[in-house]
Regions:
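Short, glycine/polar-rich helix-capping loops at beta-to-alpha or helix-loop-helix junctions
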Residues: 52-60, 76, 127-128, 133-143
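Short, acidic/small-residue loops that bind anionic groups at enzyme active sites
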Residues: 48-49, 90, 104-132, 140, ...
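Glycine-rich beta-alpha loop segments
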Residues: 1-45
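Glycine-rich oxoanion-binding loops at beta->alpha junctions
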Residues: 49-83
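Active-site/ligand-binding-proximal alpha/beta "capping" segment
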Residues: 74-111, 118
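A charged, well-structured terminal subsegment
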Residues: 79-86, 141-168
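Short, hinge-like loop/turn segments at secondary-structure boundaries
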Residues: 38-42, 61-66, 133-138
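Glycine-rich, charge-decorated loop segments at or immediately adjacent to ligand/cofactor-binding or catalytic sites
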Residues: 27-36, 124-136
Length: 168
């Protein structure tokens, strides 16, 4: 698939920039971006959690250098929020939506310093239209990013190259 190849390439480009790739550590896009990072000699961290009702994964994917096992889903997200210098959001499901919402909420309320949130493709655009009138409450976030509404916390990009460019 073209999307899979592009996510692998994204991981490779991030590693070439010297970035550590942090993900949920399991399969799908998490594995693809980690595979790409490892192919370029990069470091990967997987923040995992195993207490699903129906366990899907028994271990982190083979491309994870360091696994951090969280005690809860919320701790998993909290660890990623604290460790990341930027967030790249790929198409996904409810887990990705929860991570994105937590990231936006933490920045909106000033619980973490504002960091780049880059949305690869248009997948999440319909979800974020509801934030156009949602004000940013943190004065620090407003001043650091020169924004007033929550939808301005994110940057949409069309492709991997544009994503990497926005991280410079």
């Amino acid at each position: 698939k073209k999307e899979k190849a592009e996510i692998i390439r994204l991981g490779k480009l991030l590693a070439q920039k010297g970035a550590t790739v942090i993900s949920g550590g399991f399969g799908g896009t998490m594995e693809d971006i980690s595979r790409g990072a490892k192919s370029a000699g990069g470091k990967t961290i997987g923040v995992t959690w195993y207490k699903w009702e129906k366990p899907i994964y028994k271990s982190a994917n083979a491309f994870i250098d360091e696994e951090i096992v969280a005690d809860s889903l919320f701790e998993r997200i909290d660890i990623m929020l604290k460790k990341a210098d930027a967030f790249i959001v790929l198409p996904g499901g409810t887990g990705t939506l929860l991570e994105l919402s937590a990231t936006l909420e933490h920045m909106n309320k000033g619980l973490i310093d504002p960091k780049p949130i880059i949305m690869l493709g248009d997948f999440w655009k319909p979800v974020l239209t509801c934030l156009k009138k949602e004000p940013v409450l943190s004065e620090r976030t407003k001043n650091m990013r020169k924004i007033s509404c929550c939808n301005e916390l994110v940057t949409f990009v069309k492709n991997v190259d544009e994503c990497i460019e926005k991280l410079r």
